[in-house]
Amino acid sequence: MTKVYAHSIQQERVVDRIALLERCLDLSNSLPTAKRLAAVAVATILAIALLVVAGLLFSGVLCSPVSVVAASLFFGVGAFLLGGALVGGVLTTEAVTRERLHRSQTLMWNNLCCKTAEVEQKISTASANAKSNDKLENSVSKKGAS
C-alpha cells in the first residue's frame, strides 16, 4: 500500500513539474515584451522627429511667428519622449533578461528533478532486486536444509 501511495505522489510531482514547465516556456507570455519594445521604438522615432523639428526652428530654417516658443515645446516634448524611450528600453531589457533567467532556472530545475527521479527509480529497482535475491537465497537455503 505504501508503494502505491509513493508512486501516486511521484506521479503528481511529475504532472506538477510538467505543468510548471509548460507555463514557463509558453511563448505567449513574451507578448507584453514585444508590445513594450514596439512602444519604445515608436517613442524613440517620435522623439527624434520632434528634436529635429525643434532644431530646425531654432536655426531659422523653418519660419514660424512663435518659433522660440514652438522650438522650446518641441525640445521639451522630444527630450521627454527620448528619456521615456530610454527608460522603457532599459526596463524591457531587464524584463527580458529576468524572463530568460527564470526559464533557464526552470529548465535546470526540471533536469535536476528528472535526474533525481531516475536515481530514485534505480535505487528502488535495486532494492526490489535485492529483496527478491534475499527471498530467493532464503528459499534455496530452506530447500537445501530439508
From Swiss-Prot:
> This protein's superkingdom?
Bacteria
Instruction: Name where it mostly resides.
Output: secreted
Topology relative to the lipid bilayer, per the entry, is:
Multi-pass membrane protein
Pfam families documented for this protein = IncD (PF17628)
Q: What induces it?
A: Cotranscribed with incE, incF and incG within 2 hours after internalization.
Gene Ontology cellular-component terms for this entry are: extracellular region; host cell membrane; pathogen-containing vacuole membrane
Enumerate the transmembrane spans.
38-58, 68-88
InterPro entries cross-referenced by the UniProt entry: IncD
Q: Does the keyword Transmembrane apply?
A: yes
* Keyword Acyltransferase listed: no
Function text: Host inclusion membrane protein probably involved in early modification events of the chlamydial inclusion.
Q: What is this protein called?
A: Inclusion membrane protein D
List the source organism: Chlamydia trachomatis serovar L2 (strain ATCC VR-902B / DSM 19102 / 434/Bu)
Which gene carries the instructions for this protein?
A: incD
